């Protein structure tokens, strides 16, 4: 398959490296984040892979949608306009797959945490909290992956109804609040953890990224999946949909 890449930063370069070393895929074009995008630039591509920034993604979205080529988006920070993006995708009868993290390992981690949160729900003496660690260059916190994991915990455990990102001096957590703590240090690629605690024992579930290659490989695999899915069932997808199909659910 042929992919057009938008964004030539660290993730974009890693995606290009994965594709260039693949016998099954090739690069149709690599577009810089500041490039002028028209629908025509995507002709001949089986899918678009976007790793840019919020403003660039939203500015380029109309051209991507108009091209009719399925879109894979790793750009984060646009959850507040996701309803509008979904509407654009539906109106054009095209396809978009979005994930804050394409690593297969971290998506498996999130499912394990969701199941753990569900299992402790009947036992009030168990509590749960999340942490995420990244390099100092990462601007957003908590990470999109941590927030997605937190949302999955809230959906699985009715005892948790809201997310707390920071604690002000003197404030205490209430039992219904899920604490999501962030750390920025050095060159950490990314570590996400769930801590489950009780008076008698504790459980820790963690995922540690060793490099960006896992994120990039997952994005390429998701793009190939979406390109095939688009022909029969266009729509807005996430890595949950990708994994559900792979797992036969």
Swiss-Prot record:
The keyword Amino-acid biosynthesis is annotated on this UniProt entry: yes
Entry's localization field: Cytoplasm
Pathway of action: Amino-acid biosynthesis; L-lysine biosynthesis via DAP pathway; (S)-tetrahydrodipicolinate from L-aspartate: step 4/4
Catalysed reaction equations from the record: (S)-2,3,4,5-tetrahydrodipicolinate + NAD(+) + H2O = (2S,4S)-4-hydroxy-2,3,4,5-tetrahydrodipicolinate + NADH + H(+); (S)-2,3,4,5-tetrahydrodipicolinate + NADP(+) + H2O = (2S,4S)-4-hydroxy-2,3,4,5-tetrahydrodipicolinate + NADPH + H(+)
GO cellular component terms given for this protein: cytosol
S-S pairs: none
GO BP annotation list: diaminopimelate biosynthetic process; lysine biosynthetic process via diaminopimelate
CDD domains: DHDPR_N
InterPro entries: DapB_C, DapB_N, DHDPR_bac, NAD(P)-bd_dom_sf
Active site: 134 (proton donor/acceptor), 138 (proton donor)
Broad class of where this protein is predominantly found: cytoplasm
Residues at which NAD(+) binds: 32, 74-76, 99-102
Key word tRNA processing present: no
Residue sites binding (S)-2,3,4,5-tetrahydrodipicolinate per the record: 135, 144-145
GO terms assigned for molecular function: 4-hydroxy-tetrahydrodipicolinate reductase; NAD binding; NADP binding; oxidoreductase activity, acting on CH or CH2 groups, NAD or NADP as acceptor
EC class name: oxidoreductase
Signal peptide: none
Enzyme Commission code: 1.17.1.8
Keywords: Amino-acid biosynthesis, Cytoplasm, Diaminopimelate biosynthesis, Lysine biosynthesis, NAD, NADP, Oxidoreductase
Job description of the protein: Catalyzes the conversion of 4-hydroxy-tetrahydrodipicolinate (HTPA) to tetrahydrodipicolinate.
Record-linked HAMAP family: DapB
Family: Belongs to the DapB family.
Database matches in PANTHER family: 4-HYDROXY-TETRAHYDRODIPICOLINATE REDUCTASE 1, CHLOROPLASTIC-RELATED (PTHR20836:SF0), DIHYDRODIPICOLINATE REDUCTASE (PTHR20836)
Descriptive protein name: 4-hydroxy-tetrahydrodipicolinate reductase
